[in-house]
Amino acid sequence: DEYVNYRVNIKKNTSKEGINKTLVPLYLALDYGEKNGIVKKSVVAPILGNFLITRNTKYQSEPSEEEKTRYLTPEQMKYFYDYCKKVKSKNARIILDMFFFSYFACGLRLSDVITLEWKHIDFEKRLLSKVQVKTKRKAAVDIPLNSSAMEILERWKNYRLNDRFVFNRLPDDFDLNNQYKLFMTRNAQDKGVNRVLATVGRNAKLPITVTMHVARHSFAVKSINKGMSIYMLSKLLGHSSIAATEKTYAQFLQEKVSNDILVMNEEF
């Protein structure tokens, strides 16, 4: 309470979302202290996870969709895909599988990749059906899986590393209803995953810093250029509204319209 008062009254931070973000490292430190016997559980329990209540109480540290949209063209993605076949590090190859699966599976967020369960996959219908972690919709999103996505899934099915979670990033008894624990786990994995992707991307001489969200944006921009409807794209990305999709990809939508008009004007 004293820290929150400090943020509000001294630092003049009136955004509850902003204050909640500053609480995360404190909670991480407390969690570490308890696990290593530095702080008693009786001290930590009443404090841990007490975020301020906002309109949306699910705190996900996913990158904002409104941040600068960095993406790879289909040609750059194909080059990166071929380059990554030469990567030797086992950990890097696991993370690269997650990255390319995100791209092939219609831009799944990292939180949905790490929480992807085998029960979400219909191998016969080549369909992924899952309630997305960050979306405000409660209905599952159905995502058709192409051959490249299926190839990755078949490979992981043969690995048999986890009876529940596809990419073995969570223990099979993980409680997905524990929003605080899910947030902390995803937040802890985010930096490590993106650090590996950035390193491999840099070694591949790519023009941008590669992150998991680059896979998402690359899928979206490719889909816009291929003529996918904004309604369908919004649904596949799990956006709360079409307006959110239009806002994020406004530049690319305008470019597509302009190019289409130029083509039409060339016709007699």
Question: Where is each model-derived feature located?
Answer:
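Short, basic (Lys/Arg/His-rich) helix/loop patches that form interaction surfaces
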Residues: 87-90, 185, 194-235
